[in-house]
Amino acid sequence: VIGRVSSADKVAIAKEAGADHVIVDTKGQFGQEVLRLSGGDGVHVVYDGSGPKTFPGSLDSLRRSGTFCWYGPVLGGPGPLDIMSLPKSIKIGYAVFFDHVHTPALLHARSSQLFDWITSEKLKVRIGGIYPLAEAAQAHADMESRATTGKLLLIP
């Protein structure tokens, strides 16, 4: 697992979450380092929720027939794509939460599985901050500034 973070203070968090290697990058130019770490082949799959700046680096990181999973981009989408110019026969998907829980039964089953994983500590949830509900604007500003890691909780 190769992780990409935007600042050195997030390296330990990425390693704690299971990354074998962590690249610190703020310009979206991490593709060459991923290729080096993967022996020149690239990776099988990239999960990218950052935004348009990381899109080219994510594409460059993939091996032939790799999969690019774009999800919840915090900083906007990549803009129009010319699918004829995509390299290496890659596959691109955009994950939308509601498509995976579109029935009450699916929502119940997947939430139960999620909470089982949390309870058994198979999945660890990192709490990045706790804010009174009256400070929701500050929580949003902190998240938008990318200074936080983990989940932010609002307490009524």
Q: Whereabouts are the PLM-identified features?
A:
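Short conserved AdoMet
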Residues: 39, 63, 87, 147-148
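General small-molecule cofactor/ligand-binding pocket signal
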Residues: 23, 91-93, 126
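Glycine-rich phosphate-binding loop and adjacent beta-alpha segment
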Residues: 5, 14, 53-122, 155-156
